[in-house]
A protein has these predicted regions:
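C-terminal luminal/periplasmic domains and tails of membrane-associated envelope-modifying transferases
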Residues: 1-145
Length: 145
């Protein structure tokens, strides 16, 4: 297989709708979002060295009842470095996830953002689909701080 990716040296905002081809580990685009369908999802992003607030926007609330503990742990890495974990629970379901990125973890130019999340079986919510999904990813934003 040959994969072709368009890469912008510096780009701070990524949406599933506009940057779908830069994402790995996601299902087909559904309007403005895509489900992660692998425990590991990656996004190639163009950053310049500085500190950032990273925001991951979810498209909507998730069916937390499909998870064993009624929550989903999301861990984020930049270039292999763990930058934090957040738990999606009933209190924050559907809300954006926020992380702090240190300048020393940023490479000038191409960086790999990795999102690790638990998967759930769609059939557990009474649906006759056989898909295994993670989080409904809508957008990723890097805001310099």
């Amino acid at each position: 297989n040959i994969y072709v990716y368009k890469f912008n040296r510096y780009q701070l905002e990524y949406t599933a709708a506009d940057d779908y081809t830069k994402l790995y580990g996601v299902s087909a685009l559904e309007e403005t979002f895509c489900w992660t369908n692998s425990e590991i999802t990656e996004l190639a992003c163009g950053l310049y060295p500085t500190d950032y607030e990273l925001t991951i926007d979810l498209a909507f609330e998730m069916p937390l009842g499909a998870y064993q503990d009624n929550n989903n742990q999301v861990t984020v890495y930049l270039n292999g470095k763990d930058i934090g974990a957040r738990t999606i629970s009933g209190e924050n379901n559907g809300q954006a996830l926020h992380f702090y990125v240190n300048e020393e973890d940023v490479i000038d130019g191409r960086n790999i953002l990795t999102i690790r999340s638990e998967l759930w079986d769609v059939s557990l919510i009474g649906n006759d689909e056989s898909r295994i999904l993670g989080i409904p990813l809508e957008s990723v934003h890097f805001a310099p701080v």
